[in-house]
Design a protein with these regions (language model features):
Chain B
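Cytosolic-side transmembrane-helix boundaries in multi-pass membrane proteins
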Residues: 1-38, 42, 224-231, 301-338
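Hydrophobic core segments of alpha-helical transmembrane domains in multi-pass membrane transport
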Residues: 28-41, 70, 118-121, 147-152, ...
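Single transmembrane alpha-helix segments in multi-pass membrane proteins
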Residues: 38-43, 50-102, 106, 130-137, ...
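Inter-helical junctions in multi-pass inner-membrane proteins, predominant
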Residues: 45-55, 154-161, 203, 209, ...
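Alpha-helical transmembrane segments within multi-pass membrane transporters and channels
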Residues: 103-146, 293-294, 298
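Helix-loop-helix "hairpin" substructures at the membrane interface of multi-pass membrane proteins
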Residues: 109-117, 123-128, 181-258
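Transmembrane helix-bundle core of multi-pass membrane transporters
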Residues: 139-205, 232-235, 254-263, 307, ...
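Transmembrane alpha-helical segments in multi-pass inner-membrane proteins
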Residues: 244, 254-321
């Protein structure tokens, strides 16, 4: 045993000079990482920095081209695929590896069921599952079907699975991307408890505030290179962001331009109800950037989809420049210059198996029809224009969209929406899961669109984003619009007060 | 708007096309066709003769034309199992109409009967489409149902026997539609080429074609892009019905008769041709010329078995069944590589 003295602790897992090449492309250049027992180690970097590849190598899902991995100071070669779990190294994927039709207990023991005389010992497995869940302080029912669980509970089951396999190092790839703030808090509590018992975590995230909150040390990767490893306490969010992009981020947010109070009202919503969205009214002026804030599940996306005509509304009117918009008619809304950009770019925004051009022109294909047939050269011109305008960077123009980085996908989605020449643009979560550099670009695109006289609604769960971009912020809570903040009122504390139900404006 | 000025004059580096750029999935069916031709030539020297090959192509016409329609349905993410029954149903009604003697003039009667077949075929396709989209029933189940309905109606119309074109005058007038040639090329081959060319144009060069691929790749993305998903799917079924009608127009002059067993298992052959041709069964990429290639392959395999003496031709069904499984395996392994 090694004494737990400072500086003398032997890392559980250590990666030395790891390089990885795919075909002719080198994605990792001699990257180093060491994980100490009972440590939460954050791994950050822009999209495409090589984080995912790196943790796949460390958890045995990929084989490094060169370099070695040491477990407890001994060089090991990790067995292929999930067999590394036997060594106590567990990876929790972004998309969970849970079969929806199994119960929690069955999931936990999948592939290593306890048997007595060849028959499943259900009672023993249930008891063990309960023990692990209790240890985690989770109230998930061990007999519940996975499909009935909330996302946060599924995450908890994954963690329980890791623990029941006596994991020593748990890799988590953006664990909080799909969690609300409350769910994130629960997850972090569990992480701290396990950490106290000596389990180590490697935590990949784009959310720097969470990195600051939970991690002990941070390792920054940029373009496949190791940049820095430092105790989190010596850094702040700004410093990490700078290390990630390698340049000053002085102007993450562009300057705001408030429209004149007598500027034309382009969109007017009165008493709109749909699903559990109740009686929402607001106006949007020409050239305005209006934010919609609130907790996840507060009904913002439902409201916006009802405005755009993607879902039906039970009551209420939507007017564009004084003319009523029919219910549930997305194409009419598009024709009248309203565009909705979904937050689910992979599931609803882009055809992942297709190329960039057919994605770009999908919504505006009518513009490229000449005498009844499509004109490929017109489409190619639109693509070249969009690449310049939105700085879409790809090595090969014919790449499948599913292979592009999240940031480039998001730019392509924005370009696709803009092909319909909208005057009113609703952007749902403009920067979900993309790196700081691209975020900054998207913020500037939004500001530039507003300066051109277009009106923009930004729906976002990231408070700094809403505060940094918008001249007015609407706050929703449980389907109601509970506050409309302007000017000095726009602050994290104020928005949270409305979002959490501590304050409420009677007439909005 | 932020326009990066330095990329105004973008360098157009002409990338050299290497063998790696070739889409294996698009090429595979044609490679298989060439391979089969070589095998056939080795088995029997008569095989590679122009007469034999023209015969094979002519015989593949029914399946090829139906499979072109199936390419649309499958590309849009659906499936139509009713095509074989639909052939029997449409053909029966067409012959019954010609036997009715409603129009005295034979040429006029023939034209009217052909129009009727096209209308009935489209209507059958429309029924499939509406049951699937408006009724929100899985296409597999919906067309399994109509497959039974069309087949049952045919059996009822024919009272279990055969429906035969009575008028010898009409028969001789209609015969050239299958047996005739234009500039030495059999009419069915010309029809295949025409139907395929139109289909390829619609699928690759029109707005509707782009919508089919989008709907087949992801219904949700299509919906969020303002595409009328249900309309696109329904029209694909109508195109399928139209293609079945065209196949019937060639089928009736060939035998001048239908029965309850007409077109049995043609749905299997049509789907096989589509899959062999490289169209993904889960929707998305549609390959019309690949489909035609697939239909030729199916017919060639049968022909080779007939000409060779070492495999019984009674095994044709089993071989065709195996081909669809092999085609799926090949498709999947090629997807993984690319």
């Amino acid at each position: 045993m090694v004494k737990p003295e400072d500086g003398a602790r032997v890392p559980v897992l250590k990666a030395e000079r790891i390089s990885k090449t795919f075909g002719e492309v080198q994605v990792l250049f001699s990257v180093e990482l060491d994980v100490l027992p009972g440590e939460v180690h954050a791994l950050v970097g822009e999209n495409g920095a090589g984080k995912s590849t790196f943790i796949k190598i460390l958890s045995g899902f990929e084989v490094p081209t060169s370099g070695r991995i040491l477990l407890d100071g001994e060089p090991v070669s990790l067995p292929a695929n999930s067999a590394a779990e036997a060594l106590g190294i567990v990876m929790i994927h972004q998309e969970f590896n849970l079969a929806e039709h199994l119960t929690v207990t069955e999931s936990l023991f999948l592939g290593r069921e306890i048997c007595r005389f060849g028959v499943l010992d259900r009672r023993a497995m249930r008891a063990e599952t309960r023990r692990v869940l209790d240890m985690l302080g989770s109230r998930v029912d061990e007999n519940a079907l996975i499909s009935s669980l909330a996302v946060a509970d599924k995450q908890m089951v994954e963690i329980a699975k890791a623990i029941s396999r006596e994991a020593r190092v748990i890799f988590m790839d953006e664990p909080t991307a799909v969690l609300s703030r409350e769910e994130t808090d629960v997850l972090f509590d569990q992480v701290r408890k396990l950490k106290a018992k000596g389990t180590s975590f490697v935590f990949v995230s784009h959310k720097l505030d969470e990195v600051m909150e939970i991690s002990d040390r941070v390792t920054v990767l940029r373009d496949g290179q190791w940049i820095k490893t430092a105790p989190t306490s010596l850094l702040d969010g700004e410093a990490i962001a700078q290390l990630m992009v390698g340049r000053e981020l002085s102007s993450l947010y562009p300057s705001k331009h408030e429209p004149n109070v007598d500027e034309e009202i382009v969109l007017s919503v009165r008493g709109l109800s749909t699903g559990y969205v109740r009686d929402v009214s607001f106006d949007l002026r020409k050239g305005e950037v209006l934010g919609f804030s609130g907790l996840i599940g507060s009904g913002r996306t439902e409201l916006m989809e009802a405005i755009a005509g993607l879902r039906s509304r039970t009551t209420g009117d939507v007017e564009i420049r004084g003319r009523a918009l029919p219910v549930h008619d997305f194409r009419e809304a598009t024709a009248r210059g309203l565009a909705y950009m979904t937050k689910d770019r992979k599931g609803r925004g882009l055809l992942l198996d297709e190329g960039m051009t057919s994605n770009l022109t999908l919504q505006s294909i009518g513009q490229h029809v000449r005498h009844g047939y499509l004109d490929p050269s017109s489409e190619a011109k639109a693509m070249a224009r969009a690449k310049r305008r939105f700085d879409i960077r790809v090595r090969d123009d014919r790449v499948r969209v599913g292979r592009m980085s999240g940031g480039n996908q998001q730019k392509l989605l924005l370009a696709k929406i803009m092909e319909t020449e909208p005057q009113i643009i609703i952007i749902d979560e403009p920067t979900r899961g993309i790196d700081v550099g691209t975020k900054q670009q998207i913020y500037h695109f939004i500001a530039a669109l507003a300066r051109e006289g277009r009106s923009i609604i930004v729906v976002s769960s990231e408070l700094p984003e809403v505060i940094g971009l918008c001249t007015r912020v609407a706050v929703m809570r449980e389907g109601h619009l509970v506050g409309m903040l302007e000017g000095e009122e726009i602050s994290e504390q104020m928005i949270m007060r409305y979002a959490a139900g501590l304050r409420r404006q009677t007439a909005v | 708007m932020e326009v990066s000025t330095n990329s105004e004059i973008e360098e157009r580096v002409p990338r050299r096309r290497t063998w790696r750029d070739v889409d294996l999935r698009a090429v595979a069916p044609f490679a298989a066709l060439v391979l089969l031709l070589i095998v056939g030539a080795l088995v029997n020297p008569n095989f590679i003769g122009l007469t034999n090959l023209a015969n094979v192509a002519t015989r593949s016409a029914f399946i090829a034309i139906i499979a072109v329609g199936a390419t649309f349905v499958i590309s849009s993410g659906d499936l139509d199992l009713s095509v074989g029954s639909m052939v029997a149903f449409v053909a029966s009604l067409m012959i019954l109409f010609m036997n009715s003697g409603a129009i005295a003039d034979p040429s006029l009667m023939l034209v009217a009967a052909m129009v009727l077949a096209v209308v009935i075929g489209s209507a059958c396709g429309l029924a499939n489409g509406l049951i699937t989209t408006v009724g929100r029933i899985e296409p597999f189940i919906a067309t399994l149902g109509t497959m039974g309905i069309y087949r049952g109606l045919t059996t009822w119309l024919s009272q279990g026997g055969a429906i035969t074109l009575n008028s010898p005058e009409l028969q001789s007038l209609y015969r050239p539609a299958y047996f005739g040639t234009v500039l030495g090329v059999p009419v069915p081959i010309l029809v295949i080429l025409l139907v395929t060319a139109i289909a390829a144009f619609v699928l690759y060069r029109t707005r509707y074609g782009r919508h089919v691929v989008a709907v087949g790749s992801s219904r949700e993305v299509a919906r969020y892009s303002g595409i009328a998903v249900d309309r696109v799917r329904t029209i694909a079924f109508v195109i399928q019905g139209l293609c079945v009608a065209v196949a019937v127009l060639l089928y009736v002059p060939r035998l001048g008769s239908t029965s309850a067993t007409t077109g049995i298992l043609w749905e299997l052959q049509a789907i096989t041709a589509v899959v062999v041709g490289g169209t993904a069964l889960k929707g998305g990429a549609g390959r019309v010329w690949g489909t035609i290639c697939g239909a030729f392959i199916l017919e060639l395999v049968g022909n080779i078995m007939l000409l060779s003496n070492f495999i019984s031709e009674y095994l044709i069904g089993a071989i065709q069944g195996s081909i669809i499984i092999v085609a799926m395996l090949v498709q999947r392994s090629l997807t993984r590589k690319s």
